[in-house]
Amino acid sequence: MAKILSREELLSFTMGAMALATGGGGTRPLDEDVGKIVDKALAQGKEFKLISLEEIPDHSTIFTQLGTGGGTTTEQKLRWMNSPGCFAASGGTLRTGFDRTAFIHDQIKLKDKTFAPLNSWSELPGPDWSDAGFNRLKQLIGNKEPFAYLISEISQMLIRTLVGYAYKGWPIIDSTASGHRAVPECTISTLNIHDVPICPAVLTTFWGDLLVLEKTLSWQRADEILEGLSTYSGGNAGGPMAIEGRLVKKTAIPGAVSFTIKIGKAMRKAIESGGDPIKAMIDAADGWAYRAFEGEITAIMFEQRLGFIWGYILLKGTGGWKGHHLKIWYKNENHISWLDEQPYITSPDGINVIDPETGWGLANFWPAEWEHGRKVVVVGVKAEDIWRTEKGLKLLGPKHFDYDIPYKPIEQIVK
């Protein structure tokens, strides 16, 4: 039965998402900004209606977003830079927001003077350009209105999207295509596991480009086409695809949004009462989460290329972990870890680095957060069973990321 989410639950979603997004999903929005956009929507009578998979009409049309966002090399960034970046101590524009339309227009005019002259038929993307992919997909499928959007992953930046759903009158489906975590590639989806067709899809960039993906070999090829587009567009590209409601009910992972809210609510309550947010998270997870390491940050290594951010996180153990070291490799999200140089927790299980005092998960997209000596706790979160199948491991296991490491379930590693 549908549930109307409260302001507290929406704010709790952001904290829960930061704790579950495995270092990815962008950066943490400013707390006051989240409160403002939620309050504005509620003041206008907008409802945040959470529905279960079972409540989706079988013959309805559901949209979901394909996309990738990360980084490109400095040389590529200089050609098509679509944002000022996320390197400021404050977290940069991923947190604060900025006038992207004005920024893109300035960049296009600069390119027009140098290496990319505009044509007589060129059109600069306007403030409504963000809806271009949505509108084109509707045309392709016979102008069918979507009943709702299926969330692709758990991300702290999703709160802005949820507010957008409320303004459009769309319900929030209590489900995702990746479970209760973030993932770096659109191919890492339960829709892929269940062979849901990805075409047609509409892909756009911030530069006014729109492409219809009419046919492709596989989800993996679609993802790599998208990555190529992103690489030569400043690091971001994406757009919607459509699915019939009955297929969403069969293929998506239920309960991911409510699970995230539950985690965030428990952590916020612990912080407000002077308790331990890590213990609160693990208790609220009901057997899904494990305290996997405790220590302090030694360093973070950060590289941008091919539409992603890549690197390593180095942690030095403290307390009961004194004398031990943890290394984590990430591609947007954390995927492989080594305890004292031996394979430890890996994807598809989640690896989350969290500040035990504030309860906020640390974001790989915000390098300034990773201060040397900062105290952290690593919480591992068990993957859903579908990710532990043969096809699931091909998509989210160590070998998908070119690491020849056998996957071992977290519950067999951390007791």
Protein language model regions, located:
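N-terminal low-complexity or amphipathic/hydrophobic leaders
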Residues: 11-70, 361-384
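Conserved phosphate/anionic-ligand binding catalytic regions in large, soluble enzymes, centered on
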Residues: 13-34, 155-175, 179-182
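A structural-propensity feature for long, helix-poor, extended segments
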Residues: 53-77, 187-229
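Glycine-rich oxoanion-binding loops at beta->alpha junctions
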Residues: 56-145
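Phosphate/diphosphate-binding glycine-rich loops and adjacent basic-rich segments that engage nucleotide
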Residues: 201-266
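Flexible, glycine/charged-enriched surface loops at secondary-structure junctions
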Residues: 233-247, 278-282, 291, 385-392
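Oxyanion-binding "anion nests"
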Residues: 263-318
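C-terminal non-catalytic interaction/assembly regions of soluble proteins
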Residues: 298-415
